[in-house]
Amino acid sequence: MKNLYKWPAAQSLYPNQGKKSYAGKRFRYRLRSWLHHSKIKQFEQFVTQNPQLIPLLNARPNYSYPVAHRFLDKRFSAKQRLQKITDNLLFLPQKLAHLPPLWEQAVNFGEIIADFELWLNINEHQPMEGFWALELRHRPTNQLVYLLTFGKLDEALLIAVIQGPNFEGSKELVKQLTKSCHGLRPAYLMVETMKALTAVLGYQSLLGIPQKYQNKSAGCKVSAM
């Protein structure tokens, strides 16, 4: 039922696609779920107490997986990870309580540079890199060009990963963007934008994660959507 939450089945995350089998991924998911059974039960109780999250978690089964795997920083223990996950699922919706949930409607900040729009959205790629994202999109094509995922760490915000483009024509698009920014590289533009968002949300500090501790997915470049 849509108004109930239950820990996702492996098949909902990793269904076979044609002749391609994901049996290995399903096995690892089940094993991790078994190893983290107590944390999963705590997470289910948390969701029951915060039913506004059920539509997001039911629609995106991979948003639950970080409880049993990784989230933001590889150095987190299972206990720390669960605490960070519950905190991160709540803080931004609470800050934006006057708006529809981001999983229903992303926030368009408009053009920050000619032909390039900035969006605040859920992370539609890999939630272990953070549940929330700043997206830089090429307005004429609606192409995602740069993605910055972030979360909350205690009383600071945390940049998890910044991902650049990997689609046909992306190099020329990045050159156009860099020129429009008077030589400022797009990754630095994303950081500066995140600094501004940090201040607007009422936080004093913006942190980063050393690269070797980032939960960067294997296919981390932004592809054509």
Swiss-Prot record:
Domain of life per record: Bacteria
Disulfide links within the chain: none
Keywords: Cell membrane, Membrane
Subcellular location field: Cell membrane
Gene Ontology CC terms: plasma membrane
A GO biological-process term: DNA damage response
UniProt cross-references to InterPro entries, sorted A to Z: DUF535
Family: To H.influenzae HI_1119.
Full protein name: Membrane protein LapB
